[in-house]
Amino acid sequence: MADSEEQEDYKMQAFDADIQNLLKTALKEPGNVDLEKAANVIADQSLRDTTFSREAGRMCYTIIQAESKQTGRTMFRSSLLNRLQVEYKNRKETRARSLQEWVCYVGFMCNVFDYLRVNNMPMLALVHPVYDCLFDLVQPESLKREEEVDCLVLQLHRVGEQLEKMNCQRMDDLFSQLRDSFLLQGGLSSLTQLLLLEMIEYRAAGWRMTDAAQNYYYSEVSD
């Protein structure tokens, strides 16, 4: 338990003392704090900090579990989903304004999708928004930007298998577009081509990477 608390504390170091106290209380005694504020604080930081955006889902899951157990309510989850919906509607403007904020948002939403469960199933409300963001990332202009390609690959590794189980047709469509880009789009860097091929083979192998494939792709990336 101490190790887990230290990990959570580490993720909070970017916050001032008041916000740290808010989040620590939300994690342990969610009925005693403003959970809408806590959700917005986590979202705000996730849009600024790539590392935090990748880990925030775990914090959100912990707060949701604690709130359900202690109060039987879903205030934090509702506030979090409302904020994600607002950011989803504004995603085109976000991408135009700040590429880093955009990839942080995608990472945050995929991380929340990865962690949050209702009746042991991923949240249906997030399936199409996550897919829409991944489709944004396979557009020709996005595939010319290293940050967006890295984000695409990371999120497909993280949630691709879960997403496919929730809606196989959209995953087929996504990979059809991804394959067309790999084969037909000019101007892609050799690293992007390598990463796209890796994703195509990764899905074809049942969302698993063989040792041989891992050694090949990642020795190429490191070179």
UniProtKB/Swiss-Prot annotation:
InterPro entries: ARM-type_fold, MIF4G-like_typ-3, mRNA_TranslReg/HistoneTransl. Transmembrane segments: none annotated. It comes from Xenopus laevis (African clawed frog). The gene is mif4gd-a. Belongs to the MIF4GD family. Interacts with eif4g1, eif4g2 and slbp; probably tethered by SLBP to the 3'-end of mRNAs ending with the histone stem-loop, it also interacts with eif4g1 which is bound to their 5'-end. GO terms for molecular function: RNA binding; translation activator activity. GO terms for biological process: regulation of translational initiation. Gene3D superfamilies: 1.25.40.180. This is MIF4G domain-containing protein A. Functions in replication-dependent translation of histone mRNAs which differ from other eukaryotic mRNAs in that they do not end with a poly-A tail but a stem-loop. May participate in circularizing those mRNAs specifically enhancing their translation. It is found in: Cytoplasm; Nucleus. Residues 7-206 form the MIF4G domain. Its main location: cytoplasm. Pfam families: MIF4G. Keywords: Cytoplasm, Nucleus, Translation regulation.
